[in-house]
Amino acid sequence: MQSSLIKILGVLAIVATLVCFVFAALGMIGAVSVGNGCYMRYAPGGKGGSDSITSTITLNANANYVNTSTMLPDGTMQLTPDPAHYGEWLNTQVEVKDKQAVSLQVVGQISLCLAYVPKDNLQFTESTRPGKSNLDDNGKMIPIPRVTDVNKPPLSLIMDAKNNEWRNITEMYANDRILVSVTPNYSPGAGGTVGAMDAFKGTNVTADCSQGKTAYDPICGRYSIYSGPYVNACELKQNYWQGNKKQKCPNGCVWGTIDWCYTAPSAWCTYYYVCDSLSAWVNNYGTMPEPYKDDGTFTFSWASNSGGIFIDYANLQCSNNINIPPNGKCPDSVDDRSPKDKDYIGGAGCTSGVCNGGEFQSQRRFWYTSDGNGGKGPTGLIWQISNTSNVDSTLPSTLQFAQFVTASDQPTEYGNEYKVIYNIPFNSNTDKGYLQYRLWCPTSQDASKNTGGYVMNIKQTKCYRENGNSLTDVFNNRGQVQYLVVPSAENPNTSGKNYSPEAAIVDSKGKANFNAAGEGYIWMRVLNDPNDYKDSEGSYKVHFSTSQSVGSFTIKVMNPLLQLFKGKVKGAAESIFRNIVCYGGDTSSCTNFFNYIKALLILYVMVYGAMFLLGFAKINQKDLVVRIVKIGIVSGLMNGNTFEFFNNYLFDTIANFSDEIISNMSGYSLFNSNGTVSNPFMFLDAVMSRILFSQTFMAQLLALLSLGLSGIIYFIITVIAVMIVIITAFRAAAVYIMAFMATCILIGIAPIFISFLLFDFTRYLFDNWVRFTIRYMIEPVVLMAGIIVLTQLFTIYLDFVLGYSVCWKCALPIKIPFIGTILPVALLNVPIFCINWFAPWGMDYMSGMMGVNMQNIVALVIIAYGMYGYVEFSGNMVARLTSAAGPSATSMGGAMSGAAEQGALSQVGMDEKTRKGITGRAKERLKQRNETLKQAEKTRKNAPKEEPPKAEIPK
């Protein structure tokens, strides 16, 4: 029992292993894709005689199509471009002929170079880091990630508020895509530290960004331009200054009146001033900036002008002229120390002491933050685009304050970590520009006392091109789609030849048209600086559409064959005729057959005259006329112009009789556009050219296999029908050739048979010569008459069966059988993978349905077999019509094509040997069956009859 179980398990293991191998093989087949090409049913404009081919290729920006595999630490394999294959041409697999029209559309976006941190950037300038402002600490240029690199963070540059000048964040060329963002204001709470990546050091730098401090690192995302003391309260000081001055006269004045002394001349009265001790609201000072608070107490909100983000604390005074200290004299140096901003600073309700309850206390602002304190953008950040990269501190008359983009334009991968402030493509008439930023600060102020700063982040897609359009930056026509037409056996990447590429001039939608300059395959690449291919990224989808002329069966096969054969046969027949009559040449090597005819003619007249004189022959009027006509015909053809007469009048008329009749029946002209004689097989050109030379037809035929098992049956039946038609066409050609050759030979030996007209006992030879000549002239006509009709029917039904456009795509999905018994119903009908194959345009591979009517396929086979049988039928028909028993062109043509015909039919089991074998075996089985039945009947008759049992008689 145990051994049986082990055997069963072993068998199951072997079966499981085989199944795994089968699925692995099918998986590899399913992964194969020869392209996205399609073969269209109809050519553009509905014209026939051409294959309308569409194809799609992927054109890499780096022009590298060779990958190398690298083992990663986790054990997985990573494919990377081979460094030795950048800038190579791609074979599109689109084959063209010279001057063939090709239409294409280039779709997609690519980046053909990498952006780097510019000189005089936000973090360093050439004055602070000579010759290395754009290099990291290792002396290397710092690349900027592309906008499309969603898995990479943007490059961060730290902008210090102490730098009161325009700095470059990037260098821009036409069509560049830029994404500038700012890191939000960090508020980690008390004692918290934050970090930012320093692109120059290549490390993460940290700083304490907790609230309650008056100085911060630039990575904290806040800055202040304020420093030093400022008025933060007003205090009433009694007896602060001497005011309200009065003149006082001392004792001994003339009149002794003080009041009068005020106005009395000094000559009359000596006086002095007396003042009152007055109070004043004096400034109480604090130090700017006030400690930063996370709740935004001392933070400006975003504004679109400098007036909204600046408070001039120097002009705030509790009293007029309070900034001028009292001199202690009467009167004081100023006579006005009345309250100025006391109510605003200290509050109107406060009348003594230190007052700090004014509206000013809630409106104090010292800090600018990158989140704008809830505003529309980073506060105080201004930008401009400059034509030069020079560092400059001059502010323009109109300032552009950075703003956050709308929520819909904010990349989802940025989240709340980065806030985008610039995403405008650079489309300028200038060759290049520099995007510059700075933190706003009054130009008259010493920026070195500022504190804090912002962290700016950038992504840039440089050398951006789309839809095959090219632009000139530092490299001419960068991004131009170029093509070559190279012979099929040649590879421009390895041939070592110098080529002159052509440019595909595209419109704004990427569409272009060109005529191929040569014959071969189209190779393409994107033009770029050779040094930038390795940094290029992206790819184009190039959609091709072209109409390729299908090779003509008439031009490629029949015309060369018939012209060569007919020329040789006709020349041989003329040579025979010429040699018989010794025409136009050296007569020393030939004997003029006309001399024999003359002798026979003289003998004929002499014998017939002697018989008439001796009374052995009776001559009536009819007999006399017939004999005179015979003598006239024979004697008339025995002059030196006989050959010209036959050659110029009779030979071509008789030899080309069949061609003219067949051409008239088929509706095709016997003459080409250049006036030369064509061949009578023009009616076969459309169907035979499609079968033998059309790529679309082959794809349509192979697409039948995408139907699975039923498709295999359809495919076999259709192939059989097509093979029969091909065999019939070549057999008809063989019949035509043999008939033409026989006709030419009979005409060539005409002088011999014409002489047989003289005597009654040789006249049957002349009659048979005429009969066979007519037979071989008519036989191709009768044959082609039926073939023409059947060919038209075959063409119609062939289009019914294969009338669809074909694409290379997923056609045969592979599913696990009985999956519903193991997995949930939701996983039913889900393919594991799919095998790519030719399939009709629009067919759903999940359903496998395609509109192929079995009736049309059966009709196709019937018509094809009817064409095959009609060849023999037409030969028998002509034999009856002409009453010419003997070899026919049909039998001779069948013998010529027999070997090839039987060999082709043997592949599908329809050759004569196989059919005779099937017929013989069927007859043998029928014979054995009849013998068995006869033997059974004989046995039954010879068997003794059993008598019924006799009834027992009771005793």
Swiss-Prot record:
User: Transmembrane segments in this chain: where?
Assistant: 597-617, 707-727, 739-759, 781-801, 818-838, 857-877
Q: What protein is this chain from?
A: Uncharacterized protein RBE_1263
Main subcellular location: membrane
One Pfam family it belongs to: TrbL
Where does the record place it?
A: Cell membrane
UniProt keyword terms in alphabetical order: Cell membrane, Membrane, Signal, Transmembrane, Transmembrane helix
Q: Specify the signal sequence span.
A: 1-24
> What Gene Ontology terms describe where this protein resides (cellular component)?
plasma membrane
Here the segments flagged for biased composition (Basic and acidic residues) are: 910-955
**Annotated stretches, region: Disordered:** 127-146, 905-955
Any one biological process term the GO annotation gives? protein secretion by the type IV secretion system
Please report the record's description of how this protein sits within the membrane. Multi-pass membrane protein
Q: Which domain of life is it from?
A: Bacteria
Give the organism, scientific name. Rickettsia bellii (strain RML369-C)
The Swiss-Prot or TrEMBL record describes its family as follows:
Belongs to the TrbL/VirB6 family.
InterPro entries named among the record's database cross-references:
Conjugal_tfr_TrbL/VirB6
